[in-house]
Amino acid sequence: MSKLGKKPILIPSGVQINIEGDMISVKGPKGTLSQRLSPYIKVAIEENKLWVQQNEESIVRRSQRKMLRTFQGTYWSLIKNMITGVTEGFEKQLEIVGVGYRAQLQGNKVSLQLGYTHPIVLEPPVGVSVEVPAPNVVVVKGIDKQKVGQFAAEVRSWRKVNVYSGKGVKYRNEVVKLKEGKKA
């Protein structure tokens, strides 16, 4: 059994969990998320606790036990993130550092000027919202942790931080260790 799989997930009030076949859906105050479950996993709900268990019936060989433990921990984390997403939501903050580098909103799209000859216009996926509180700060919010992280990584990938000058797009809490330049 995985370390996480031994612990139950507490279901907060205001959250409804529905399990139909191989699909689990979590509904909360911020929205609804659903996830397909592996045939190697069983999900059981007791009162306000959710247990992620290995499906012993799906084992054909003994070598599959290790794989089942990894699935159990992975699905435990996925379901926990779904519950956190529909109750609190997720947020990633990006900082833009550099002269002339800035961001602005155009409707629901974000326009980035990162030193290229043209502005980069990115449209967030469904369920993800973007805010630009300052020209050098981009805030990505949503209920799906995977989509929020993926879109933030996509924004960052257009101009990663230069390790010599420190210019580029970085996460708010990211520490960039600057390298020393060439000495003559």
UniProtKB/Swiss-Prot annotation:
<dbReference type="InterPro" id="IPR020040">
    <property type="entry name" value="Ribosomal_uL6_a/b-dom"/>
</dbReference>
<dbReference type="InterPro" id="IPR036789">
    <property type="entry name" value="Ribosomal_uL6-like_a/b-dom_sf"/>
</dbReference>
<comment type="function">
    <text>This protein binds to the 23S rRNA, and is important in its secondary structure. It is located near the subunit interface in the base of the L7/L12 stalk, and near the tRNA binding site of the peptidyltransferase center.</text>
</comment>
<dbReference type="GO" id="GO:0002181">
    <property type="term" value="P:cytoplasmic translation"/>
</dbReference>
<dbReference type="InterPro" id="IPR019906">
    <property type="entry name" value="Ribosomal_uL6_bac-type"/>
</dbReference>
<dbReference type="GO" id="GO:0019843">
    <property type="term" value="F:rRNA binding"/>
</dbReference>
<dbReference type="GO" id="GO:0003735">
    <property type="term" value="F:structural constituent of ribosome"/>
</dbReference>
<keyword id="KW-0699">rRNA-binding</keyword>
<dbReference type="InterPro" id="IPR000702">
    <property type="entry name" value="Ribosomal_uL6-like"/>
</dbReference>
<comment type="similarity">
    <text>Belongs to the universal ribosomal protein uL6 family.</text>
</comment>
<keyword id="KW-0689">Ribosomal protein</keyword>
<dbReference type="GO" id="GO:0022625">
    <property type="term" value="C:cytosolic large ribosomal subunit"/>
</dbReference>
<keyword id="KW-0687">Ribonucleoprotein</keyword>
<protein>
    <recommendedName>
        <fullName>Large ribosomal subunit protein uL6</fullName>
    </recommendedName>
</protein>
<keyword id="KW-0694">RNA-binding</keyword>
<dbReference type="Pfam" id="PF00347">
    <property type="entry name" value="Ribosomal_L6"/>
</dbReference>
<comment type="subunit">
    <text>Part of the 50S ribosomal subunit.</text>
</comment>
